[in-house]
Amino acid sequence: MVGEIGGNDYNYAFWQGKTIEEVKTMVPEVVETIKQATKRVIGYGATRLVVPGNFPIGCFPVYLTKYQTNDATAYDELHCLKELNNFSIYHNDLLQQAIAELKEEHPDETVVYGDYYNAFLWLLSKADLLGFDPTSLQKACCGIGGDYNYGLSSWCGDPKVPVCENPNERLSWDGVHLTQRAYELMATWLVRDIYPKLQCEYIVSYSSAV
């Protein structure tokens, strides 16, 4: 697994007040860094690599709080901010182009895209069926304040910030990261998506046996 790389670079830029268009100018450089890091890992002898993409950041409490608006058209059917998710799609599209180039440059290695974006959207869209609280899907478990239980100046870890009673019923832990239960289910989706693409005989035979 190479990364995830770039998420904190974008987070920092957004928190410095840069616009989406300004942050988009960073994406080619970030993707090139990921590509070079992957090539370096290949140089160390790796033959099967997973390179993960970006989450749909417009679905996360931290961004829903920072960019909250009364404009209903800014949100999609899952109540995610469309412009921010489009930013993630832009990053992921460039990353998949870079992975295609890596495959051409290293035909003897298997390089697979880790689709964090669609894994999380699956989790969010099926959350009520998976045992999560449907009234708190975009509220932080560890947080305080606002519609998303996330305070821009009161973060998880502050003695004044409470924790929800049952984290296993929440997707978001602290507004930025997921709960262990959410990560577990997302990982299950990713494994099922990635394993067939890794071209590993043991994995194929094991998958067909379970």
Model-derived features with residue positions:
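Short, conserved phosphate/pyrophosphate- and ester-handling motifs at nucleotide-, phospho-/glycolipid
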Residues: 179
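A short acidic, glycine-rich active-site loop
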Residues: 23-29, 76-88
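Mobile gating loops/cap/lid regions near enzyme active sites that modulate substrate access
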Residues: 56-82, 97, 101-104, 108-176, ...
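Oxyanion-hole/transition-state-stabilizing segment in secreted/luminal serine hydrolases
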Residues: 1-25, 43, 47-66, 170
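Stable alpha-helical elements in mature extracytoplasmic
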Residues: 26, 30-37, 91, 95-98, ...
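A structural motif corresponding to the C-terminal end of an alpha-helix
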Residues: 36-48, 90-111
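C-terminal alpha-helix
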Residues: 189-197
